[in-house]
From Swiss-Prot:
The gene is selU. It comes from Shewanella woodyi (strain ATCC 51908 / MS32). It comes from the Bacteria. This is tRNA 2-selenouridine synthase. Belongs to the SelU family. GO terms for molecular function: transferase activity, transferring alkyl or aryl (other than methyl) groups; tRNA 2-selenouridine synthase activity. Residues 15-138 form the Rhodanese domain. It is an enzyme of class 2 (transferase). Keywords: Selenium, Transferase. Involved in the post-transcriptional modification of the uridine at the wobble position (U34) of tRNA(Lys), tRNA(Glu) and tRNA(Gln). Catalyzes the conversion of 2-thiouridine (S2U-RNA) to 2-selenouridine (Se2U-RNA). Acts in a two-step process involving geranylation of 2-thiouridine (S2U) to S-geranyl-2-thiouridine (geS2U) and subsequent selenation of the latter derivative to 2-selenouridine (Se2U) in the tRNA chain. Its EC number is 2.9.1.3. Monomer.
């Protein structure tokens, strides 16, 4: 029987277009990592998959297939098919995939076809598409010149990146600002999902035929998200552009990021009282995370200042008290650390300037 299969040669088009896909793997597989445009409608739930897997190891493929059919039949089977059909009704051009493009894809496709709809499955499945995206990341630094956007904390690197088509926002895909105060309310993606989003962004960047690739100066770890090794090594050899901003501007920006945005985010999710409590814990835990570097005495000083600022905010609805600890954080922690790190790679710095000057430099490079 001939099958409706999407070949491996279309992986680039699938990722660039954000083609809707049905992932028929079990939820435990999907939760570890999937593709940005995929939705999980499993052929088997986790417990069913585990039983079939055990049967396969002990009794072989035929017995495992028979067990799978016995577990997913009747009303259960109809519920699975109905879920697929509902998705296909919303996305008539959908593809489906399993782990390797094997039995689960073929069986799902067959059941959908028996219901009157013929949709293709992706050759090679999740495993092959995932490998393709890994190769996209590994090869990206060699595709075009890479520039690293550096700058002292609060200089607005992310704001700048979001205005540039040459840029890929690593922190955005990691969902973390890359510092002790960098976490967001919602948490970070899995490592696989971080990498998959990065790969798709790089594909789109290459499709635009940009003159260079601009990324922020990052450590190997952005929160708990690790930059893929080959890509990170490419960053270590790239020229550096340093963004410069006045201290007052930096303080205002960090007050907005660390205090206003985080507080409002927690309140939006948890309500006024619980949100303020969670916000307070976020500030305290962020300082505690760098206690070893600060030393106990300075750490305790920070906690005291933060506590006073939180009390002022709670009692008077005034956030200006937070500027004291933010200023101290810059002068006693971030700024010395940044200056030391920049000195280690000073020979790679090719330009320093304000936001406007940096835009002009990159525009000139792009149009040269």
């Amino acid at each position: 029987m001939s099958r409706n299969i999407i070949p491996k040669t279309t992986y680039q088009e699938i990722m660039l277009s954000g083609h809707p896909m049905i992932d028929v793997r079990a939820p435990i597989e999907f939760d570890k990592g999937a593709f940005p445009s995929s939705s999980n409608f499993p052929l088997m739930q986790d417990s069913e998959r585990q039983r079939v897997g055990t049967c396969y190891k002990e009794q072989g493929q035929d017995a495992a297939i028979a067990l799978g059919h016995s577990l997913v039949n009747g009303k259960v089977k109809q519920q699975r098919v109905d879920a697929w059909l509902a998705f296909i009704k919303q996305h008539p051009d959908a593809y489906l995939y399993c782990f390797r493009g094997g039995l689960r894809s073929q069986l799902s496709q067959q059941w959908i076809k028996e219901a009157g709809v013929d949709i293709p499955y992706v050759e090679g499945g999740y495993k092959a598409m995932r490998q393709y995206l890994i190769e996209v990341i590994d090869n990206a630094p060699a595709k075009q010149p890479v520039f690293i956007l550096s700058g002292i904390t609060g200089s607005g690197k992310t704001d700048f990146l979001l205005q540039r088509s040459e840029a890929v926002d690593l922190e955005g895909y990691a969902h973390h600002r890359g510092s002790s105060f960098g976490r967001y309310h919602e948490g970070q993606p899995t490592q696989i999902n971080f990498e998959n989003q990065l790969a798709v962004a790089l594909l789109k960047h290459q499709e635009r035929k940009e003159q260079c690739l601009l990324v922020e100066d990052e450590s190997f770890l952005i929160g708990r998200s690790a930059i893929p090794k080959a890509f990170y090594e490419g960053m270590q050899n790239a020229d550096i552009l340093v963004l410069e901003e006045p201290e007052e501007t930096r303080l205002t920006r960090l007050l907005n990021e660390y205090v206003h945005k985080m507080h409002s985010g927690y309140v939006e999710r948890l309500g006024e009282e619980a949100g303020f409590t969670a916000f307070s814990e976020y500030l305290s835990q962020s300082i505690t995370s760098i206690k070893k570097r600060l030393g106990s005495q300075l750490h305790d000083e920070f906690q005291t200042i933060i506590s006073k600022a939180l009390n002022m905010q709670l009692q008077q609805n005034d956030t200006q008290g937070h500027l004291e600890w933010i200023s101290l954080l810059l002068t006693r922690y971030y700024d010395p650390m940044y200056q030391y790190q920049l000195e280690q790679k000073q020979e790679r710095v090719i330009f320093k300037g304000s936001h406007q000057a940096m835009h002009e430099w990159l525009d000139h490079y792009r149009n040269r």
